[in-house]
């Protein structure tokens, strides 16, 4: 980009309050990988901290949810609000790389993520987990998290486990592959909208 052009700060804060959850998220895309995460679900906090560290995003998240019922509402709504914040922080997507992909190992597990920030919300998820729950987190919610995220982030996300046995390793590899795919996709590599339509 021309030297006299100052890149805008890509950040956004989004809040969402319902009868089930009360959530505020701040995202800084061009950050240092710092995460201050309090979703109320310890394992989800761990996964989101990993996402921040490996994507380079900074994120502050607080969620007060109806965990006395179960983790479903909190996990789903956290994903929806994060997706909205990222979408808003991407501004008009001028110069965006747009596409990103990564294959990430974690011991015996191997995860793949490919994504498109082109405004088309769709998630394809191929993974199975033997353990139904980890630290209060229902593993069936991994897929639902990414489906919800894709909706509000307006992104096409493909995730798959290629190898693996340990449930924790597989889920962490998925989040890390998503992090590295996002790190690639949000790079500014040009000066125009990356679409023949002229708008994303």
From Swiss-Prot:
Gene3D superfamilies: Imidazole glycerol phosphate dehydratase, domain 1. InterPro entries: IGPD_sf, ImidazoleglycerolP_deHydtase, ImidazoleglycerP_deHydtase_CS, Ribosomal_Su5_D2-typ_SF. Disulfide bonds: none annotated. Pathway: Amino-acid biosynthesis; L-histidine biosynthesis; L-histidine from 5-phospho-alpha-D-ribose 1-diphosphate: step 6/9. GO terms for molecular function: imidazoleglycerol-phosphate dehydratase activity. Keywords: Amino-acid biosynthesis, Cytoplasm, Histidine biosynthesis, Lyase. It is found in: Cytoplasm. It comes from the Bacteria. The keyword Manganese does not apply. CDD domains: IGPD (cd07914). GO terms for biological process: L-histidine biosynthetic process. Its EC number is 4.2.1.19. GO terms for cellular component: cytoplasm. It catalyses: D-erythro-1-(imidazol-4-yl)glycerol 3-phosphate = 3-(imidazol-4-yl)-2-oxopropyl phosphate + H2O. Its main location: cytoplasm. The keyword Cytoplasm applies. PROSITE patterns: IGP_DEHYDRATASE_1, IGP_DEHYDRATASE_2. HAMAP family: HisB (MF_00076). Belongs to the imidazoleglycerol-phosphate dehydratase family. This is Imidazoleglycerol-phosphate dehydratase.
């Amino acid at each position: 980009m021309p030297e006299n052009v100052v890149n805008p700060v890509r950040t956004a804060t989004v809040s969402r309050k319902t009868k089930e959850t009360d959530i505020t998220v701040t995202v800084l895309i061009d950050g240092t990988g710092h995460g201050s995460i309090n979703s109320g679900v310890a394992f989800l906090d761990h996964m989101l901290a990993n996402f921040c560290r490996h994507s380079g995003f900074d994120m502050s998240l607080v969620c007060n949810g109806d965990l006395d019922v179960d983790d479903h509402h909190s996990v789903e709504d956290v994903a929806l609000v994060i997706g909205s914040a990222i979408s808003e922080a991407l501004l008009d997507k001028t110069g965006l790389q747009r596409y990103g992909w990564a294959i990430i190992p974690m011991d015996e597990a191997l995860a793949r993520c490919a994504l498109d920030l082109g405004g088309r919300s769709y998630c394809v998820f191929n993974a199975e987990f033997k353990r139904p729950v980890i630290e209060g987190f229902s593993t069936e919610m991994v897929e639902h998290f990414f489906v919800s995220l894709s909706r509000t982030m307006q992104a096409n996300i493909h995730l798959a486990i290629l190898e693996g046995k340990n449930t924790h390793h597989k889920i962490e590899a998925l989040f890390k592959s998503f992090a590295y795919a996002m790190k690639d996709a949000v790079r500014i590599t040009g000066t125009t909208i990356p679409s023949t339509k002229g708008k994303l």
